């Protein structure tokens, strides 16, 4: 019923969580019945069972979770897994360099499976203290994220760029221009100094410049509204806000 509702409203696809979440075979059946694709999977354990954890057993479990998400993405005919690669927690045991090194090592372990199944592993920019300065100003750049992706050096790894997440720390349109073809998918939400995370179109994001930047890099991938769900009216509002602010439709 949820797939049917989203299809009727005008959505082009959905994402699921893994490990866990809804039964993937049932979801695939619903996708086929309604014609609404499942375009990807979100790794559901990456915040707690981090690939950057100082504990080797936790990293192993995180890698197992990523591999499960990759398999589930393939099962539901998706194209990618969204991954938060780690989090900077303390200066001694999980600092920026350690998060960098450990996460890249674990991602490399997952890449043979990703390549075999044709599934991208896409890094989301989040408030994890990684690849930006959480105490810095609002003119930070995407240079570190670009460098991180380039060091992984795989056609199966790219950016799942979240437009709203780094409005506080930089200009999303400039991040888009810097990342360029590294961006494979987008997460869409609003953020503003006065209202924090908010509805798409509210807040401080310069949506016209975001649209210009996406056109400049030739972006044609999936864009996901990373916002709270709800009833038909709520989901119609989210859809219409995506159309207006991301696509520039009247």
Residue locations for each model-derived region?
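Active-site acidic/histidine proton-transfer and metal-coordination neighborhood
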Residues: 32-33, 52-161, 166-168
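Catalytic domains of carbohydrate-active enzymes, especially glycoside hydrolases
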Residues: 2-21, 75-77
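Hydrophobic residues within beta-strands of alpha/beta enzymes
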Residues: 14, 39, 81-82, 121, ...
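Mid-chain, structured segments of secreted extracytoplasmic proteins
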Residues: 33-54
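Active-site-adjacent beta->alpha loops and helix N-cap segments on the catalytic face
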Residues: 21-30
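Histidine-acidic metal/acid-base catalytic patches
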Residues: 1-7, 77-79, 142-250
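Active-site beta-loop-alpha junctions enriched in small/polar residues
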Residues: 17-19, 43-46, 86-88, 119, ...
